[in-house]
Curated annotation (Swiss-Prot):
This is Ribosomal protein L11 methyltransferase. It catalyses: L-lysyl-[protein] + 3 S-adenosyl-L-methionine = N(6),N(6),N(6)-trimethyl-L-lysyl-[protein] + 3 S-adenosyl-L-homocysteine + 3 H(+). The keyword Oxidoreductase does not apply. The gene is prmA. Gene3D superfamilies: Vaccinia Virus protein VP39. The keyword Magnesium does not apply. It is an enzyme of class 2 (transferase). HAMAP family: Methyltr_PrmA (MF_00735). It comes from Pseudomonas fluorescens (strain ATCC BAA-477 / NRRL B-23932 / Pf-5). It is found in: Cytoplasm. The lineage of its organism: Bacteria, Pseudomonadati, Pseudomonadota, Gammaproteobacteria, Pseudomonadales.
Amino acid sequence: MPWLQVRLAISPEQAETYEDAFLEVGAVSVTFMDAEDQPIFEPELNTTPLWSHTHLLALFEGGTEAASVLAHMELLTGGPLPEHHSEVIEDQDWERSWMDNFQPMRFGQRLWIVPSWHAAPEPEAVNLLLDPGLAFGTGTHPTTALCLEWLDGQDLKDCNVLDFGCGSGILAIAALLLGAKQAVGTDIDVQALEASRDNAGRNGIADELFPLYLPEQLPQVQADVLVANILAGPLVALAPQLSGLVKSGGRLALSGILAEQGEEVAAAYAQDFDLDPIATLDGWVRITGRRR
């Protein structure tokens, strides 16, 4: 049986209003999807986890008229709808279809990110087991790719790595699987630290190899390698602190930076690091360098 699917681009603040309205006009299901690939972690009880840019998908039984649904929605919500799209889709195995959307991804020469339900394409490669979802997004965001590709190209043997803003732990876990001696993770979100611990366990990484801290608990480490995939503003503000956490001769990789923000972030680190040319991917950049 075919279904009518209506997709709306919404903000988190609009979620409850539009969810209730869709159910009121007869939707058999309402789901939320990440519109950009932003990590988001397990929510507190009685809260709805949402991304800053979210797609709401409402599913209706076949034969439902899209124009009628949209007209009733505007009446219920009191105004024009946000950007939207409707289409008729054929019935299918929805769980299988969702899983099929996420295939193993290769970063650099050695590293693969592999969903748990999929066989590793190259069993002898470095395979990081990580399922897409709340703790990871799809994994295709350019900032993540830039950092993973950089790590894949480094000699990490016997290195101590610091993942500042570790989120799901993907960068630290990748570093350990690529040969790092130890990785330290820190994040402002306790739930992110829990996600990192869970993902490390899936990859056979012992707790002592990947200690995790809130920022105020972070010891004064001297890292051989520091990675920070956060945002340009915090990277600039934290430049003195982050620079101080890298030993002389140590390496730095920063991302979460839009192309137009690259020069500002680079300038904040230029006095302490010999910087490489800025790497760019799909409007995002990565800044790397070596501590003087």
